Amino acid sequence: MIIDGVKISETKMERLKNEIEKIKNTGINPKMKIILIGNDYGSVVYSKAKMRRGSKLGIDVDLDRYDSISREDLIKLLKRYSQSDDIHGIMIETPVPGINYYDVVNEIPFYKDVDGMTSYNLGNLYLKNEFIAPATARAVVDILDYINIKSGNVAIINRSPVVGRPLSMMLLNRDFTVTVCHSRTVNINEITRSSDIVVVAVGKPNFLDRSYVSDKNIIIDVGINYLNGKTCGDADYENIKDYVNAITPVPGGVGPVTATDIFENFINGLKYQIKG
């Protein structure tokens, strides 16, 4: 089975659009700020995609772009936007050249943190509070919900604060059994072949080949790579798709769902601000 992330995203977009319409009918103009520093190709592409998606939802997404910025000036900018009643969500595109992202992201109030990367929002995952969660991790959970997978053994090949760590907690909150694998894990392919679900996010094209999979696997490919002028994932899609239970393609899998989940975070935070 090929899991269609575009369809999952479109279904959620309709619901979110209705929610935004209701909010706008109260006289509020939802607005989000994206801060982009440098000229990283992927960050530029993602920023423009978020602006287009926000426009479809009726959200004003404004891009602030800088060739470079000091840590002090970035913090001043974040504080100004954080204090503005007219700005309801803030995100910093990564990478941030010359600045430790985790050193500045906590300047954003938790309710305006559309990436879900402040210490407050990450910590809340441990308490089963997913009010605002990292969008990629939320997207994986959404995909499993969509295909009605409620339990099982999961191997996550990633331990980053963006994917592996928050996702492991969100899956534990749903009673999945989780194994987190990384560069020092021994015999990863034995772990993945015996798992019901494999989430791969290593940043290496075609990393997950047939030696890692079995016909019981559901493969969730979080990777986004560029190889020979084309976008591809971390899974060797063409060579494993017929040998697994189900798989998300790249593009058209996790990516569209992640992009939509950023705006679910935005709306959750906006509702919190409206309630005061």
Swiss-Prot record:
Query: Which EC numbers does the record give?
Result: 1.5.1.5, 3.5.4.9
Q: Which positions does UniProt annotate for NADP(+) binding? A: N158, R159, S160, S183, I224
**What is its pathway?**
One-carbon metabolism; tetrahydrofolate interconversion
Biological process (GO) annotations held by this record are: L-histidine biosynthetic process; methionine biosynthetic process; purine nucleotide biosynthetic process; tetrahydrofolate interconversion
Which pairs of positions does the record mark as disulfide bonds? none
One cellular component term (GO) for this entry is:
cytosol
Record's function text:
Catalyzes the oxidation of 5,10-methylenetetrahydrofolate to 5,10-methenyltetrahydrofolate and then the hydrolysis of 5,10-methenyltetrahydrofolate to 10-formyltetrahydrofolate.
UniProt family annotation:
Belongs to the tetrahydrofolate dehydrogenase/cyclohydrolase family.
Quaternary state and interactors: Homodimer.
Q: What is this protein called?
A: Bifunctional protein FolD
What species is given as this protein's source? Picrophilus torridus (strain ATCC 700027 / DSM 9790 / JCM 10055 / NBRC 100828 / KAW 2/3)
Upper classification of the organism: Archaea, Methanobacteriati, Thermoplasmatota, Thermoplasmata, Thermoplasmatales
